[in-house]
């Protein structure tokens, strides 16, 4: 039986794998080699707030009634235009605690480029991020459960649109979001990786 709940610190290891799977080309360019990236995520996921905080994610878990064990098999996070100062401060704090000053300067430089491609959500939008399902559980409708959760939250927050950025080469993902009634409204190339990202929108 699958259940959706708020992420917790003990979900960090599973979330690290799921989050990396959402952007395997981009994340190492932004946050360093695989080991550096894992170190950063391991730290950031344990914080109570911030972009990569486990608590900022909803996780899909499969529950074994006999053993009472849980396995995290999917995740999603939500971003809007007013995440608060604590979100920003803890995102920055996580970086300061892991990266050198040279690395931080590089990340800040790259971030300016990223913001021109991954445009932050406007006041009437809710952005979905880190949508991921473990490969062995794909094809069971779990991705649609995550999308449905995001749409419900957008309605509760009074938003007019749900947005997501998708690598245009990820045909499986593009087709999936189209099947969930998302439409492509923009296409932008990211020179850092040579990828083209589609801004896909679901209108409420």
Where do the language-model regions lie?
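Conserved beta-strand in the GNAT
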Residues: 59, 69-80, 127, 132
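Active-site rim helix/loop that mediates acceptor-substrate recognition in acyltransferases
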Residues: 34-57, 65
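Conserved acyl-donor/pantetheine-binding loop and adjacent beta-alpha core of acyl/acetyltransferases
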Residues: 82-125
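Conserved acetyl-CoA-binding loop-helix of GNAT-fold acetyltransferases
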Residues: 139-152, 175-179
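Conserved GNAT-fold acetyl-CoA-binding loop/helix
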Residues: 23-45, 85, 96-101
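Conserved N-terminal entry element of GNAT/NAT acetyltransferase domains
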Residues: 1-10, 73, 203
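Conserved GNAT acetyl-CoA-binding A-motif
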Residues: 124-126, 154-165
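C-terminal "cap" of GNAT-fold acetyltransferases
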Residues: 96, 159-171, 179-180, 186-204
